[in-house]
């Protein structure tokens, strides 16, 4: 039986009475954002709106984006990435679970030196897919051209964010490439792997 979104007690500063809010709303107030599902237009717009609002609220305080996503639609994912580059606050990206496809693209899009993967996280990159196989011949040609442009964009961004040569990214994206947290660090998708300490919880490790 589904339990729905957990709710917690929260009181706004200056309010005499506490109220119940869903846990994500509470965490948003601490500038903690979550990408925890497949990427589509609705989720993309929600994250973009939150980043813009929190940026306007305090442009000097960092944002934290936790990524556990199998990927999703390319254009909504690029929209999230572009917003991350546009807003004034630095955005930390933290991978837990899986960051695949556009999820890894967004993970790599965090501020350099502020991208982290949990020790058992998995990262996957591959080329963008399309539904052109259902299209008519003319539509197939147009969509194939568009997908080639999108792939070129993703390849260029991955190269910029990871430091890998463009030809390496291009070849690796031809198939599904899965990486452990340490492999993603070596590849340049993240900067650190979080290491669990008995006394101090998780901390980033070079």
From Swiss-Prot:
Enzyme Commission (EC) number: 3.4.21.92
Any GO BP annotation: protein quality control for misfolded or incompletely synthesized proteins
Location(s) in or outside the cell: Plastid, Chloroplast stroma
Catalytic activity: Hydrolysis of proteins to small peptides in the presence of ATP and magnesium. alpha-casein is the usual test substrate. In the absence of ATP, only oligopeptides shorter than five residues are hydrolyzed (such as succinyl-Leu-Tyr-|-NHMec, and Leu-Tyr-Leu-|-Tyr-Trp, in which cleavage of the -Tyr-|-Leu- and -Tyr-|-Trp bonds also occurs)
Chloroplast recorded as keyword: yes
GO molecular function, one term: ATPase binding
GO CC terms of this entry: chloroplast stroma; endopeptidase Clp complex
Catalytic center residues: 101, 126
Organism superkingdom: Eukaryota
InterPro entries: ClpP, ClpP/crotonase-like_dom_sf, ClpP/TepA, ClpP_Ser_AS
Principal subcellular localization: plastid
Key words of the record: Chloroplast, Hydrolase, Plastid, Protease, Serine protease
Main enzyme class: hydrolase
Biological function: Cleaves peptides in various proteins in a process that requires ATP hydrolysis. Has a chymotrypsin-like activity. Plays a major role in the degradation of misfolded proteins.
Subunit (UniProt): Component of the chloroplastic Clp protease core complex.
Family per record: Belongs to the peptidase S14 family.
PANTHER family: ATP-DEPENDENT CLP PROTEASE PROTEOLYTIC SUBUNIT (PTHR10381), CHLOROPLASTIC ATP-DEPENDENT CLP PROTEASE PROTEOLYTIC SUBUNIT 1 (PTHR10381:SF15)
Protein name: ATP-dependent Clp protease proteolytic subunit
Organism: Solanum lycopersicum (Tomato)
Gene: clpP
């Amino acid at each position: 039986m589904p339990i729905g979104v957990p709710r917690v007690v929260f009181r706004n500063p200056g309010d005499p009475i506490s109220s119940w809010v869903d846990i994500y709303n509470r965490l948003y107030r601490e500038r903690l954002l979550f990408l925890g599902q497949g990427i589509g237009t609705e989720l993309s717009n929600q994250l973009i709106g939150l980043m813009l609002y929190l940026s306007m609220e305090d442009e000097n305080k960092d944002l934290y984006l936790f990524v556990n996503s199998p990927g999703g639609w390319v254009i909504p994912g690029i929209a999230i990435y572009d917003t991350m580059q546009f807003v004034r606050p630095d955005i930390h990206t933290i991978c837990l679970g899986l960051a695949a496809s556009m999820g890894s693209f967004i993970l790599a899009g965090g501020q350099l030196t502020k991208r982290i993967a949990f020790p058992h996280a998995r990262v996957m990159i591959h080329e963008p897919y399309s539904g052109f196989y259902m299209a008519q011949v003319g539509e197939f040609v147009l969509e194939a051209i568009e997908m080639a442009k999108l792939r070129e964009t993703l390849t260029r961004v991955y190269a910029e964010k990871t430091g890998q040569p463009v030809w390496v990214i291009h070849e690796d994206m031809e198939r599904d490439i899965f990486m452990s947290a340490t492999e993603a660090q070596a590849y340049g998708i993240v900067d650190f792997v979080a290491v669990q300490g008995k006394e101090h919880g998780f901390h980033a490790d070079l």
